[in-house]
Amino acid sequence: MNRLPSSASALACSAHALNLIEKRTLDHEEMKALNREVIEYFKEHVNPGFLEYRKSVTAGGDYGAVEWQAGGLNTLVDTQGQEFIDCLGGFGIFNVGHRNPVVVSAVQNQLAKQPLHSQELLDPLRAMLAKTLAALTPGKLKYSFFCNSGTESVEAALKLAKAYQSPRGKFTFIATSGAFHGKSLGALSATAKSTFRKPFMPLLPGFRHVPFGNIEAMRTALSECKKTGDDVAAVILEPIQGEGGVILPPPGYLTAVRKLCDEFGALMILDEVQTGMGRTGKMFACEHENVQPDILCLAKALGGGVMPIGATIATEEVFSVLFDNPFLHTTTFGGNPLACAAALATINVLLEQNLPAQAEQKGDMLLDGFRQLAREYPDLVQEARGKGMLMAIEFVDNEIGYNFASEMFRQRVLVAGTLNNAKTIRIEPPLTLTIEQCELVIKAARKALAAMRVSVEEA
């Protein structure tokens, strides 16, 4: 690979990149050159902050491996040929594994026909995916709006709730502390981390936050809003807070929130962007309590780790506010044929291989192992918790969490922290992780903690 000069034209840059894309393998010198290029371009044209983040959680204090390809369903290979077990899962993207052949084949077959829709004619895969989601999702959820990401699915949910509740004089939204719903302006108004919120203040008016898992706080907020005339349009929450640190609410919490929403005439929006698609041992986390939301947000794993897609699914009563003018909320690429092909294949794989049940089985195995390590290393580990294949190890302080991620990197296991809780390392592997790989992950965690204890004692 010849190095591009700093003054290279856009044509030269694109040709250089296409040459790289066509390559199946790289020799040693090409790998070194690519690493240097990627680091330089991140620093000069993407964001140097990403380099410093990776430096803090990779072995040797370097900038980390440069990703080259998937090694299998559950592994990644860097440009140095090192293979890593993926326990990060792209923050919940790879539920059916990396490059799942069923998903890749569906996308390739659709690509051979028509990659994007005309915008004017009816596109069949959007219709088929909407029908499939109506059959898959709980309760009376029936109509789907398609977009490209989780934050877009939340934006659509908020706008849908506003359109439905505004004629009823209800404009307030209640979210929860520790919540993460995205970083676009509406979704950020529901997100609860000051680091992300403060630079963009003031956010949208009418959002309140109450402690997650505290049903009395939720009741009080709904009641006070009613007394002051700030009636609540919707309650939005995650069944399990992912970026908050994999925080599980008390048993019965979702059921109680559903009852409060019914009592006060508020819609219930469940953000299952991270918990959905089999991640917690059920297809959707709300199914653990048989709770049926009015609006459901999906993304991440819906595209099978191959295509980006988000979906906002609602009951007919709520969604009908868009019937008269379906152009009130649209997006150019939402529901495109390639994304819908990926989503349909993903759903098929999840059901055919019963991956939600596998997530429950293998998640229990991993969590048992992590809890045993927490008992062995109480000086380092505060708690291990989770449900299915969404788990977290919380450490006694932030620095230990970063060190653990770095040590796991040495053991060739990828993990990462959560955006709203720096003490917590998230374990979110593909649901296709094998039993043998689960055992290797636990062994790697034990080695990492042992090395960390030695470092602490020597210090």
UniProtKB/Swiss-Prot annotation:
- Give the transmembrane ranges: none
Query: Keyword annotations for this protein?
Result: Aminotransferase, Pyridoxal phosphate, Transferase
One Pfam family this sequence matches: Aminotran_3
Name of the molecule in the record: Putrescine aminotransferase
Give the UniProt family note.
Answer: Belongs to the class-III pyridoxal-phosphate-dependent aminotransferase family. Putrescine aminotransferase subfamily.
State the Gene Ontology terms under molecular function: diamine transaminase activity; identical protein binding; putrescine--2-oxoglutarate transaminase activity; pyridoxal phosphate binding
Could you confirm whether the keyword Protease appears in this record? no
- What organism is the protein native to? Escherichia coli O17:K52:H18 (strain UMN026 / ExPEC)
